[in-house]
Amino acid sequence: MKQPILLAIIGRAKDTVNYETAFRQLEVNCFTTLNMQDASAATHLLLPGGGDITPALFGQTNHGSYHIDTELDLLQFQALETFIASGKPVLGICKGLQLINVHFGGTITQHIDTADQHRWVGKDQLHYVYHSSLSRLDFFYQLYGNSTLVNSAHHQAIEHPGDHLIPVCRAGDNVIEGLMHDSLPILAVQWHPERILKSGGDILLQYFLSLTAL
């Protein structure tokens, strides 16, 4: 018998309402927590969007980062490490993509030159992202083909991808918008699928929920 899905969202409750609402619309049991024992009981992990990652965690001084929450960063890294060790599925959204990248040794550009095309302007901005992997077996191509329209609310981006992470899609300015691990059930996107469920976001979230532990 297949184990029921239980999704742990690692964040502060005041910041995760959109995520819980989206997954409950997909009839998924989910909860927000900062307790690692509670999180480890879940079948799936979500690392949500939020402020910027503490630059020291990827070997830089602060030159453009803000809304930093180092305590939360460290708890999210701890949860990620726990799920990696158990081979359970992980999804990173926005900041979550950047956390996953940093965990695997990647770096972040703290303020991209094209930030005005990506950042929050009182609402999400919309732009296309394009398949960029050499393979057609990655999740992005399987779900969306060569391109899809996404929402955007960020001013930072991946500089160098971490070890074993494959960029699967990019924006028109070459910003990496999606990653997957080459052997673990880990994927991440720079956009916010939870806010565009009826415009293709549900496809990605359902795919993530279909993944199982190794």
Q: What kind of region is each of these model predictions?
A:
Residues 175-182:
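Short, surface-exposed beta-strand/loop micro-motifs that present aromatic residues
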Residues 143-145, 182-183:
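Short hydrophobic "helix-edge" motifs at membrane interfaces and signal-peptide entry regions
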Residues 1-93, 101-109, 113-144, 159-165, ...:
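N-terminal beta1-alpha1 cap of cysteine-dependent amidohydrolase-like domains
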Residues 98:
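Cytosolic ligand/metal-binding cores
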Residues 157, 168, 178:
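Short, surface-exposed charged micro-motifs
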Residues 152-155:
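A glycine-rich beta-turn/hairpin centered on an aromatic-Pro dipeptide
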Residues 187-191:
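Active-site-proximal beta-strand elements of phosphoester/diester hydrolases
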